[in-house]
Amino acid sequence: MMPGPFELIIILVIVLLLFGGKRLKDIGGDLGNAIKGFKKAMKESTDSINNKDDIVEAKIIKKEIKQEK
């Protein structure tokens, strides 16, 4: 069950009182940087896997060309 708008406002006020505006801004920035870093790592991982697949495919094609000669 999702909290309603009134409950979300109360939670936001409590969090703001606990951490303060500057600290909350820092936490948001850190969270944004963490998400950006995670997405970058996922993309690099995918690129690496695709690169390895390309190398394997090139080796297979090279073998096929040798067999045709």
UniProtKB/Swiss-Prot annotation:
GO biological process, one term: protein transport by the Tat complex
Domain of life: Bacteria
Subcellular location field: Cell inner membrane
Location (main, coarse): membrane
GO cellular component, one term: TAT protein transport complex
Signal peptide start-end: none
PANTHER family: SEC-INDEPENDENT PROTEIN TRANSLOCASE PROTEIN TATA
Function: Part of the twin-arginine translocation (Tat) system that transports large folded proteins containing a characteristic twin-arginine motif in their signal peptide across membranes. TatA could form the protein-conducting channel of the Tat system.
Family to which the UniProt record says this protein belongs: Belongs to the TatA/E family.
Record's protein name: Sec-independent protein translocase protein TatA
Native source species: Vesicomyosocius okutanii subsp. Calyptogena okutanii (strain HA)
Name of the coding gene: tatA
